[in-house]
């Protein structure tokens, strides 16, 4: 739609998030990429009119766990911005999000308009997930940044038991940093693990209930842990 022009969609079965649910034989008026009015037999000055003939119209779908915008081709390392060898829990993928990814138009055609893009890792913590609009606009793509910390005790390299112990130890270290009101050292973590101040800050946000910790679990024992 050209900026400033209006689009009128007529006679659709509109599924809303309101208590009334489905509004049958309903019109939708869109201008400048925004829904302006919803109702029956709308009288508006629209430059373009499309008759839906009872087709279903829904709000945009959300991809709640994806690498949209941060991975282009999985097998090509140069096109992957979903992982880091420097950071773990503190990895934020916001600055790497590509609103012009070739995968975005494909997903838009399937009705997906929003993504929760999640970094990945073979270790315990993969990093911080952020929510983006698939508007293809560099300025308007970010919805919410660093809203959840993701990890896994059941996939990737290493023992499940070791990951569970590291989960306990890393949260314990972060809690002691909170109690000390500042960063001191990583005492209590294995020498092979390396946590930056950025990583510890992310764990502190989890402990203070500012953001959730989402951990992948593939076994009943993982969940019971």
Residue ranges and their predicted role:
Residues 14, 18-58:
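Histidine-rich, glycine-flanked metal-binding segment
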Residues 15, 67-69, 121:
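Catalytic metal-binding/acid-base residues of hydrolase active sites
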Residues 24, 81, 85, 94-101, ...:
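Soluble non-cytosolic domains of exported or imported proteins
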């Amino acid at each position: 739609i050209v900026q400033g022009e209006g689009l009128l969609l007529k006679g659709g079965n509109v599924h809303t998030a309101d208590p009334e649910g489905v509004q049958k034989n309903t019109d939708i008026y869109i201008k400048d990429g925004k829904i302006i009015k919803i109702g029956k037999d709308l009288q508006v000055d629209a430059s373009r009119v499309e008759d839906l003939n009872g087709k279903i119209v829904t709000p945009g779908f959300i991809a709640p766990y994806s690498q949209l915008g941060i991975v282009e081709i999985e097998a090509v390392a140069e096109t992957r911005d979903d992982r880091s060898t420097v950071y773990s829990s503190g990895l934020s993928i916001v600055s790497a999000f590509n609103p012009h990814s070739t995968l975005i138009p494909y997903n838009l055609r399937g009705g997906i308009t929003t993504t929760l893009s999640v970094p990945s890792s073979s270790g315990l913590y993969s990093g911080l997930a952020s929510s983006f609009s698939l508007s293809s606009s560099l300025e308007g793509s970010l919805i919410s940044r660093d809203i959840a910390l993701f990890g896994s005790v059941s996939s990737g390299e290493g023992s499940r038991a070791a990951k569970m112990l590291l989960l306990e130890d890393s949260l314990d270290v972060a809690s002691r940093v909170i109690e000390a009101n500042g960063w001191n050292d990583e005492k209590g973590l294995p020498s092979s693990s390396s946590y930056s101040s950025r990583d510890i800050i992310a764990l502190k946000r989890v402990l203070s209930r500012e953001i959730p910790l989402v951990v992948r679990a593939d076994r009943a024992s993982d969940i019971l842990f």
